[in-house]
Amino acid sequence: MESKEISIRSRTPPSKLYSIQSCIGRGNFGDVYKAVDRVTQEIVAIKVVNLEHSDEDIELLAQEIFFLAELKSPLITNYIATMLEDVSMWIVMEYCGGGSCSDLLKRSYVNGLPEEKVSFIIHEVTLGLKYLHEQRKIHRDIKAANILLNEEGMVKLGDFGVSGHIRSTLKRDTFVGTPYWMAPEVVCCEVDGYNEKADIWSLGITTYELLKGLPPLSKYDPMKVMTNLPKRKPPKLQGPFSDAAKDFVAGCLVKTPADRPSAYNLLSFEFVKNITITNLKSDVDLIKQKKVQERYTKVPKYPLQNRLYKNSNTVRGKEFWNFESTRLSTTQISKEELSPITQDSPTSSLNMESPYLLHGQTVTPITNPSSSSFRKCTQPVFELDSGMDIDSGCPNAQAETEIVPLSNHNKKHKKNDIQALKIEKFDYLKNIVSHILNRMYDRARDDETRKYVNEMLKQFIKTEANVPGFNEVFIEEISLRIEAIKKGFV
């Protein structure tokens, strides 16, 4: 216990022990960074939980971390240490450089993985759950995004941010998880609570997800799914799949928890009994190559100090320029939580699902630049609704890398104490253009559309290399045009 206490209350700030490299993930419980141990040079993953914006009690978080420290299995991401710095808790874990199974679906197998690969993945996950349940612990958030791969293509269960310990009463009564993967008893918040069998239901949904590319009912709104799940019959795996795969999914998706097989019993099912492959290294290598080509990056929900964003103490996390937010809702949700759109908007593309166009809104035609080089914009600055100005390029404007404070525009906002956010060496290609096109790639309905989106990204990269600053001016002109239209200067 003493070593754990030292781990939690280390006097050395974690920022002095680890060198943060990049943000590799974000979720409701914090941001995940790739980092390097300054002493051993070991690459690790660090989940930084912003306690100021978390509803979790620090002692409860500590209890969760203590039982995570007890897990020792090659099928579970290894826990290393936990430290506190300022208002953040740093949870240091083993780094899985191969990404997640969700990455495989998004970048290589949009219509589902081959059955033999799913069989291997689920076999490893089932073994991991068997170990976890034997330790009297529940994962509570099994899905493709939380099944991680290391550099060698081996499977590991990750993201234990919402895991729970099975108490002596063998039940949990907290409402945690992701709607499409939730077991009926979790959605109902039954009086008797739920046990490790909730993970078995989620395992069945995840198997379905890996085979078909999406979880069942994903075309419906998450709240509707939660409302109707207890009343619906269990989903069935239909299509050109083996009887073994269908039997496995059906075995997991039994509504009565007591009738579901345990993880131990699932290992005797034919679907996971006769696996033919031993790793997914070739897929991991391909995904890593694609991420390099796409200049893949994540924008943290709560950026660390001295990184991309610099802010005063008065600026709260929800007021950062969040590139992953949409105009559909004021609630920020992660990319994995976005439900697919099923009905075409009158203004949407035939091949692309778009929740962004408002009713009656149309797409303006593309205009050609007057020359191959760009000059500074000399027209007045249009103030954005986000509370930030775009550099006008006028003589009295501040440096290009700084967003100037607002003056009269503050009257339109409830909070007047928000200071300007400074952006240092901002990469418009990586953080805006590439980010947008990657989202469009993920939302494309067919391979042909994805091919065109990918070609478009290549053109932006090529143009930026030949005409430095192209993407910055491009984004600036779009913003200015939108604001002009809003103000009636059509």
UniProtKB/Swiss-Prot annotation:
Active site positions: D141
Domain spans labelled Protein kinase: 18-272
Pfam families per record: Pkinase (PF00069)
Keywords: ATP-binding, Cytoplasm, Kinase, Meiosis, Nucleotide-binding, Nucleus, Serine/threonine-protein kinase, Sporulation, Transferase
Main localization of the protein described in the UniProt heading: nucleus
S-S bridge residues: none
CC terms in the record's Gene Ontology section: cytoplasm; nucleus; prospore membrane
Protein known as: Sporulation-specific protein 1
Gene source species: Saccharomyces cerevisiae (strain ATCC 204508 / S288c) (Baker's yeast)
